[in-house]
Amino acid sequence: MLNYNAPTDGQKSSIDGANSDQMQTFFWLKKAIITARKEQYFMPLASVTNMPKHYGKTIKVYEYVPLLDDRNINDQGIDASGATIVNGNLYGSSKDIGNITSKLPLLTENGGRVNRVGFTRIAREGSIHKFGFFYEFTQESIDFDSDDGLMEHLSRELMNGATQITEAVLQKDLLAAAGTVLYAGAATSDATITGEGSTPSVVSYKNLMRLDQILTENRTPTQTTIITGSRMIDTKVIGATRVMYVGSELVPELKAMKDLFGNKAFIETQHYADAGTIMNGEVGSIDKFRIIQVPEMLHWAGAGAQATGANPGYRTSMVSGQEHYDVYPMLVVGDDSFTSIGFQTDGKSLKFTVMTKMPGKETADRNDPYGETGFSSIKWYYGILVKRPERLALIKTVAPL
């Protein structure tokens, strides 16, 4: 009887002689396993400001500070009695009834040179930078590779890589530009963030309430506009809430959070949202914040305090031979807080320029006289203009293992 035995297991079939073997020992599943493209979370938050030609690489914009604002610092102030005062902003941002009453711009019957105020403007600016990378391939890599869709896969991954780089750079810039920063626990800086002691740097419900209060005082809208659609031409407005971005490491901590009454603070999306209002990556809400889980969320490895054997189970990294706590951000992006800067764009998304030259006459030169090597490159311009840094907010905390 003729039997088949698997050659890959080291046993020949009965028909194969000493110098013979099966030619096909596996079935090739032609459709390659493609790593899922990392989704975008931050790029859809802003439109793109187009940098025109012949104006350099920097965009500037003025922000005019309101009259009644502590940031309106000027030397033009004259009060109701005619005396020169330090700041010409009347009572500024004060909410004290006594202070407001004493600085009201009252006029007498004769008027006079009183109640002079001044104004302040702040210049914001951002610059664009050029990014790019390429890969090379030979004619034989195309002709003889077992995957006849090789070039298609490589072209797709080229574009995906550029998109992911842009997403990471934008996230880095948003974290660095945050004008409102809170530290969990008793910490007052990155270097004092710890998971130990009686007041560890673990985010609490009170931290979220405090952050919402500060953002409200900063006039941050409780709605967020997100660019959607396959061509990035549609928008979706998320109202009456603020959007908070966190890494996967913090989600267990948030799900275990208790409110001021000892009840579960975290509400899963299935309890309040439908398919039309849920955002990409949204996992739930706490107080006024809708929580977006970002798998590629950045953090500061080893930027916290030195860890000891008393670490109850929070993430650390080795720095100069010592374990230090990792610092994890919880990022809130207020509406219209920033804009991306591009060059020759459509005003909705960054424009990528791809150039491909196949092996042959196009690539033949003194370095490759036979024209056996081709290449594909991608380049783009990127920049960010932070218009209202006070609407970008962070809570810095430790994260459990």
Swiss-Prot record:
GO terms for cellular component: viral capsid. The keyword Translocase does not apply. Keywords: Capsid protein, Virion. It holds the Pfam family Phage_capsid_4. It is found in: Virion. Assembles, to form an icosahedral capsid with a T=9 symmetry, about 60 nm in diameter, and consisting of 535 capsid proteins. This is Major capsid protein. The lineage of its organism: Viruses, Duplodnaviria, Heunggongvirae, Uroviricota, Caudoviricetes.
